[in-house]
Amino acid sequence: MERGSALLKRMLWWGVRIGRCGSSSPKPAGFGIPQVLNQTLVILIVTLTITVHMRHGCRCAVICVEGNIASGKTTCLDYFAKTSSIEVLTEPVLKWRNVRGHNLLGLMYQDSSRWGITLQTYIQLTMLDQHTRPMISPLRMMERSIHSAKHIFVENLYRSGKMPEVDYVVLTEWFEWITKNTNVSVDLIVYLQTSPETCYERLKNRCREEEKIIAMEYLEAIHQLYEEWLIKQTLFKVPSPVLVIQADNDMQKIIEKYEENRDRILTPYNMQHCL
């Protein structure tokens, strides 16, 4: 098992390096592969990596992109989705908007005291599905996780007095059972650290129907919880190393940050101490 895991990690590392050779990024010393072969080699390495994974029972890497509403998670996922060896899973928002004809997300924003528990129960279910579905690539990048659903959004409802303690306890019991009995582990959290003010401006510009009534106070509360959880690490146990990327900048600078951190993001096995 250990031998297969080590081989898997090495192959993933080479896949990431080869994928970069056609870009302006510097090549590793002695690494001279014609650009025309890059894509073929990446596909070959990915195929071999998956084969090693299946034969040796190795677990592939799961990277979760975390951050406030409108912090830039979709932009991050879209950027790395261009990498051949990555499976990208966005938040299942469409499911939350249409549960057999019911828009749970919209109902929650309209009356969180009434619909908070209903939405968060369904979110926990759909995020569990995201974590446990079979992996089709060596790397899976997820938009948020079952961990942030509980530690950020459920916690916010409870702290703000919009979720009764009994509902909070039931969701906590479910979450603890899930984490003990299913594999929802994470190898790396990429935290897009963004000010509530920036998120609020982006929120207004993207004009999503359900988000029109989101107040600055809500974004500030979510930001505070993320800071407690991932930066101060005083809220709940953090399930993996954390890589912090400042995401208040304009689009071009943020993309430059992604490129600067590409190797650290795509080889999470090497991330021992990110903070």
Predicted segments, located by residue:
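A glycine- and Lys/Arg-enriched "phosphate-lid" helix/loop adjacent to the NTP-binding pocket
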Residues: K150-L225
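Conserved lysine of the Walker
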Residues: K73
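Conserved substrate/cofactor phosphate-moiety recognition/catalytic segment
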Residues: K82-T126, F153-V154
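Hydrophobic anchor at the beta1->P-loop junction of P-loop NTPases
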Residues: V65
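Hydrophobic positions on the alpha1 helix immediately C-terminal to the Walker A/P-loop
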Residues: C76, F80
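NTP-dependent small-molecule kinase module
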Residues: E2-R10, W14-G15, R20, Y200-L275
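Extreme N-terminal, non-catalytic leader segments
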Residues: E2-G15, G19-G22, P26-K27, L41-A61
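P-loop (Walker A) phosphate-binding loop of NTP-binding proteins
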Residues: N68
